[in-house]
């Protein structure tokens, strides 16, 4: 099976119980042609991660972060392509951040899976870019050239002005993923 969705990410993780915690198999990162055939799913869960479709700010190169920018038409067509790719895959639960772009992406995908609940989780929102949100890279460079270069080279060392660090995002998202994982048992 080959899955490729323009400018979108679709990843599949198979989780199964292990003696030292869950065992994870990565099934797909847009193309599975390089992988060996999968064994039967067996016990455990399969998680499909889909990045939201394009927005006008993505297209323009603006830092979005936590500003709630909706999908554009191309983003909706990307979500429809993900829906089509996943139409025959059984889905029994779905999660999204509380922002409209991932929520709409999920709703479009779930239109082929009626009755599947979509739970929104605050902790899954994107990194808060603070004062950089809504700005083009050239605008950020004008005021924060050194910090922008550091962000490109070592993002884990940067706290954007009035924004979050990678560690902040990690802490809140891990809590959310643990909540999701515990609901799969």
Task: Enumerate the predicted regions with their spans.
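Acidic, low-complexity terminal tails and accessory targeting/binding regions
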Residues: 2-49, 130-139
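Helix-turn-helix-type domain boundary/helix-start signal
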Residues: 3, 69, 158-159
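Phosphate-coordination/substrate-recognition cap region in phosphate-metabolizing enzymes
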Residues: 5, 11, 21-23, 80-149, ...
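Short, solvent-exposed loop/turn segments at secondary-structure junctions
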Residues: 18, 32-34, 54-56, 100-101, ...
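Active-site-proximal alpha-helix that buttresses catalytic centers in soluble enzyme cores
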Residues: 42-116, 143, 164-173
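A short acidic, helix-capping loop that chelates divalent metal ions and anchors anionic groups
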Residues: 58-59, 127-132, 157-161
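Short glycine/proline- and acidic residue-enriched helix-loop micro-motifs
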Residues: 147-168
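Short, intrinsically disordered, charge-balanced linker/junction segments flanking boundaries
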Residues: 183-185
């Amino acid at each position: 099976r080959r899955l490729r969705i323009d400018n979108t990410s679709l990843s599949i993780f198979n989780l199964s119980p292990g003696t030292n915690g869950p065992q994870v198999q990565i099934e797909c990162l847009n193309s599975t042609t390089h992988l060996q055939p999968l064994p039967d799913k067996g016990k455990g869960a399969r998680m499909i991660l889909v990045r939201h479709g394009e927005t006008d700010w993505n297209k323009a190169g603006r830092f979005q972060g936590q500003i709630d920018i909706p999908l554009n038409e191309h983003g909706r067509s990307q979500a429809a392509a993900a829906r089509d790719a996943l139409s025959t895959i059984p889905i029994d639960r779905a999660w999204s951040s509380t922002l409209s772009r991932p929520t709409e992406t999920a709703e479009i995908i779930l239109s082929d899976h009626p009755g599947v609940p979509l739970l929104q989780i605050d902790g899954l929102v994107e990194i808060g870019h603070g004062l950089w949100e809504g700005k083009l890279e050239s605008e950020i460079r004008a005021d924060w050239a050194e910090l922008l270069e550091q962000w490109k080279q070592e993002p884990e060392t940067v706290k954007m002005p009035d924004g979050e660090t990678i560690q902040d995002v990690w802490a809140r998202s891990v809590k959310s993923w643990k909540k999701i994982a515990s609901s799969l048992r």
